[in-house]
Amino acid sequence: MAHRCDSQTTRPRAKVTRHTSALGRWELATAPPAEALRPFAREYVGWSEQVSAPLCRRELPTEEAPLIINFGAPFHLFAPGDSRRSLDLASFITGAYDTYQLVESVGASSGVQVNFTLLGIRLLVG
């Protein structure tokens, strides 16, 4: 059976947030997945940022598994206090952690992120 476009059915629109300051600018678009995908994915995120210097973020623990598809220079990922656990990655999947991780970018990046549930990422990558 072919799927028909129904004018009565509406999908939630993406929410776009923009910020500009002396340090640079960024834009973030977020949207929920279709209802049928919500047991497997929590959110879609798109971003673009340009800042004047390298930027280091503290990513807090989560019960999700983000898939990051980066269109810019690779990110530098490392565990706090352990420089031996360091990676340079353009695109990657993270897992659930019990502590924060540090992610450094060179100042300009853009990409897409899908925040999967743990079940969703297990089904995707096995």
What is each of the regions a protein language model found here?
Residues 2-126:
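Alpha-helical bundle regulatory/interaction domains
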